[in-house]
């Protein structure tokens, strides 16, 4: 394989990621309804026909975008939790800090806002976001809480509801910034929220001596 051929192969392999990155910007700026595939192709520096080689519909492109939006955080959660053998006391603060870092990417909250705003007109948006992001996060957290209950660390209760309690305030913090602006007097600092909430939620989750 010549150097030129190798460069072309690398360029071709990078195209899906470049298209997804461009699509994320376009979706955030224009919403799902207003996003045009021609704009995505132009921003990605490819022909519109090239885009269709990888994504047949705008819904397919959004699915890939939704997956990419939180991939780094999801993989970190899944890998960290899979290899983790310690207490949930040590794991929850790490996971929330990583979530805060990923949510700090302005495009991720923008995608969330778009889903909330347009899911009634485009029900598939909510379904895609649920399947690619929400279900994976809550599913893994539920498993972690259930395992901690089996070890006698976490009090009795529905582990799925506990999982929502863990991530809920972080989601609310992101939505607050998106709706009211990060310059609001009450807009939460996500890193500080992650630290304080980890302490608060663990204080409620942990089983104390005496079984309470």
What kind of region is each of these model predictions?
Residues 1-46, 53-60, 86:
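Basic, helix-initiating cap at the start of DNA-binding domains
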Residues 20, 27, 32, 36-37, ...:
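Amphipathic alpha-helical segments enriched in hydrophobic/aromatic and basic residues
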């Amino acid at each position: 394989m010549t150097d030129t051929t190798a460069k072309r192969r690398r360029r071709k392999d990078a195209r899906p990621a470049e298209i997804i990155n461009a699509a994320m910007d376009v979706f955030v700026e224009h919403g799902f309804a207003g996003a045009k595939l021609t704009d995505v192709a132009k921003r990605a520096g490819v022909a519109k026909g090239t885009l269709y080689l990888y994504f047949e519909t705008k819904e397919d492109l959004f699915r890939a975008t939704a997956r990419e939006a939180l991939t780094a955080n999801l993989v970190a959660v899944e890998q960290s939790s899979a290899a983790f053998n310690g207490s949930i006391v040590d794991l929850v603060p790490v996971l929330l800090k990583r979530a805060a870092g990923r949510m700090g990417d302005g495009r991720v909250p923008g995608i969330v806002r778009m889903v909330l705003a347009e899911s009634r007109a485009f029900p598939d948006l909510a379904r895609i976001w649920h399947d690619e992001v929400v279900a994976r996060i809550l599913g893994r957290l539920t498993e972690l809480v259930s395992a901690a209950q089996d070890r006698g660390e976490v009090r009795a209760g529905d582990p799925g509801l506990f999982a929502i309690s863990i991530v809920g305030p972080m989601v609310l913090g992101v939505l607050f910034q998106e709706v009211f602006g990060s310059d609001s007097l009450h807009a939460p600092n996500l890193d500080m929220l992650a630290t304080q909430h980890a302490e608060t939620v663990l204080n409620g989750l942990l089983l104390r001596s005496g079984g309470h």
